Amino acid sequence: MEELEKTQKFQKKKKQQQEKQDQSSPINFEMSSRSSLHSLPQTTIESPPDSPTLSSIPDSHGSSPHTIIPTPSVAKTETPFRVTNGEEEKKVSESRRQLRPSFSSSSSTPRESKWASLIRKALLGFRVIAFVSCLVSFSVMVSDRDKGWAHDSFYNYKEFRFCLAANVIGFVYSGFMICDLVYLLSTSIRRSRHNLRHFLEFGLDQMLAYLLASASTSASIRVDDWQSNWGADKFPDLARASVALSYVSFVAFAFCSLASGYALCALRSI
């Protein structure tokens, strides 16, 4: 009897243990599943810019702690950009640095090159006229010595000496400028607009034009005064011829100064 009671108690204990194990098994399974979910690596899914993004928030009904619901997203705007190579950047920088248009032979139009060539030839013609008139003027003035019944000479009057000196200076300057223009026309070289050539040429042409004008005026006044005092003679006639040629030199230098002034104002190489 005692053994039967012991066996019955033992069987009851086994049944109780089995029931406890059966009750604890679903809890352990749920805990293990939760731990496995947390241990998995989190992966992010990139959504297109127009589709709504997804965010995880806990469900209010408590069905699962990781319920995924859509949320609206803000569209991203990208600023457009342009890829340029090094050559284009250099061209852009050079065009920004360049403040004045270039008047080189490659960029000039046929009309501009023809106009520049015409001005060169006209300037050369005026230089030749000034050169010849100055040469003849001071030659006639130098030859006016011991002429007429009075045997008077030009070096006795400062007005005639002044006219002689002005024509000599104009003769030398015109000779140098003629050589320069002939060289430019023969080699077809355009002058640089960055040097002081145009400023010097315009300034010297103006100075010589005013110098010849004042010298010719003073010499002509002296000739009229001599003739009013002593009458007509060979000496004042030669002096008058020299003064007339000096006026021609003044007109030639005036036109040369106009051409050089155009080159200075237009900043072109002629």
Swiss-Prot record:
It is a multi-pass membrane protein. Homodimer and heterodimers. It is found in: Cell membrane. Residues 143-161, 222-246 are extracellular. The chain crosses the membrane at residues 122-142, 162-182, 199-221, 247-267. Residues 1-121, 183-198, 268-270 are cytoplasmic. It comes from Arabidopsis thaliana (Mouse-ear cress). It comes from the Eukaryota. The keyword Cell membrane applies. Pfam families: CASP_dom. Residues 24-66 have a biased composition (Polar residues). Residues 85-97 have a biased composition (Basic and acidic residues). PANTHER family: CASP-LIKE PROTEIN 4A1 (PTHR33573:SF38), CASP-LIKE PROTEIN 4A4 (PTHR33573). Keywords: Cell membrane, Membrane, Transmembrane, Transmembrane helix. Belongs to the Casparian strip membrane proteins (CASP) family. Residues 1-110 are annotated as: Disordered. This is CASP-like protein 4A1. GO terms for cellular component: plasma membrane. Residues 100-110 have a biased composition (Low complexity).
